Amino acid sequence: MTEASLELLAPRADVWGFLAEPYHLSDWWPGITGVDPDLRGFAPGARWKVHSTKRNIFTGSRVVETMVLIREIEPYERWSWHLLQPPTDVEVRLHAVAGDRTLVRVAVSRGNPALAIKRLYDLVQTAAEL
């Protein structure tokens, strides 16, 4: 697993509230452009249909669908999921730090977790400024 971490300028409860909303996944997870959660929403065992755009220099862009399986949730501390295509295991951990800040750690079996953390940082920072 490859891991990245960054301190966010928001309390852990606010960051968790953002992460626990299925529709926000496409706002911060690279490559995902839309989410259709099942009726369980943010719960272990839930399956979310996710959309992404595949780009090919010969055939152009096309929308593809895959599935996210929510594995484990420890409220305000961690959650893990598995993306079916491309096969990727993900774990997000939150740690409260001084001054109403949150240390977020993202570990992935494939890809660059720093991209997700940077997008999450930008979104949380924007919300904190509103």
Per-segment meaning from a language model:
Residues 14-19, 25, 50, 70, ...:
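Hydrophobic pocket/interface hotspot
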Residues 36-86, 99, 115:
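Glycine-rich portal/gate segments that line the openings of hydrophobic small-molecule binding cavities
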Residues 77-130:
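Beta-strand/loop substructures that line and gate deep hydrophobic ligand-binding cavities in soluble
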